[in-house]
Amino acid sequence: MLKPGDIAIVSGARTPFGRYCGKLKDFTAQELGAVAAKGAIERAGIDAKEFDHVVFGNAQQTSGDALYGARHVGLRAGIPIETPALTVNRLCGSGMQSIVSAAQMIQTDEAKIVLAGGMEAMSQAPFVIRGRDGFTLAPGGKLEDSLMVALLDTYCGSYMANTAELYGSEQGITRQMQDEFALRSQQRADAAYKEGRLQEELVPVPLRNHKGEATGESLTEDDHRRPQTTIEGLTKLKPAFGKNGTVTAGNASGIVDGAAAVVVMSLEHGLKRGLKPLGRLCGWGIAGVEPKVMGRGPVPASKIALQKAGLSLDYIDLIEVNEAFAAQYLAVEKELGLDREKVNVNGGAIALGHPLGATGTRLVITLLYELRRRKKKYGLATACIGGGQGIAMVVESMN
């Protein structure tokens, strides 16, 4: 039954996720965001002039013009100059936060139609030397890898991988369990591509050469995937953060570039226009957790979202949990009591990659397309967030 304040996601599209320093390395986050935005707008069948606001998530500003964020996405996508834009940063939850912010704007009558999404150009994270006030006597400052520095939570003194290992150890998650789950992610993603499932949510990115000239080629699929992955190969990988660790390059999410976008409006407005929305927002939840076990964030966030939706896990048909690390996912699965057969059925971030600011939107898009494909009703999307947070969203398929 239609209720006042019901929010619809009318359409969704995302770019393929490009491997680190691969085919998308020279694209800014805003450029990728615009590609996804154009795809979502076209699929919605709405004139770009009708949008009242643009909200895009971005975690790490990597290009020189990154501070213009959502504003440049909107302008590049053909949104009128008069339409304002907002860039949000809830780290790994930024892409989902953009949908929440869009919904809140609509519910408070600040907007009728909002373009929301997330974007990240991780390959463009620069090396930096800190020393704006100059150097005296000693040689120049230390060169930092801004991407690696960002993965260290200085409040708790732990890298993201270490927080996943701690949370995993608390829940009895072994290295073997992590590698087996990582293999599942690769196999599920490979099967999804072979059966043409993931392609439905993608819009190609036209490629260009080092001179900025179009090559005539496009990136049409997620190329971080490793379909030939074996359990033997995963077992041989060394821990990435300490010899006694369990997180490896094979059982952690991939560093990639990409963007995703959705068109959000009130459900009533969408139905009056004769549109066929992908889904309805039933509720969302955001929670804080201990930073040293930041991967636990989806547990309280999912409970809040389910409570707001008036549902229990028993009613959820499909679930998307961001695979920041296999250890983190498995610990969340254990705490929430998730049925793995319902979760990440087309693979997850271990196979596809995790472009920080875009992932939250990607989770929701993937979830809605798969619910429609299977003719199922309810879905839950959730992600952990560096610094000790979690975000979750419950959706209902409208198809």
Predicted regions located by residue number:
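Conserved catalytic cysteine-centered active-site region
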Residues: 58-113, 154-160, 228-254, 335-362, ...
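Active-site pocket-lining segment
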Residues: 162-165, 201, 211, 282-351
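Flexible glycine-/small-residue-enriched beta->alpha junction loops
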Residues: 113-166, 170
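Active-site-proximal alpha-helical scaffold in enzymes
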Residues: 89-120, 168-197, 261-268, 333, ...
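Conserved beta-ketoacyl condensing-enzyme motif
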Residues: 25-114, 118-137, 202-219, 292-293, ...
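Short, well-ordered amphipathic alpha-helical segments that serve as non-catalytic structural scaffolds
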Residues: 30-45, 69-73, 98, 160-167, ...
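Condensing-enzyme catalytic core mediating Claisen C-C bond formation in acyl metabolism
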Residues: 1-27, 229-296, 300, 365-366, ...
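N-terminal extracellular/periplasmic Venus flytrap/periplasmic-binding protein-like
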Residues: 13-15, 26-35, 43, 177-267, ...
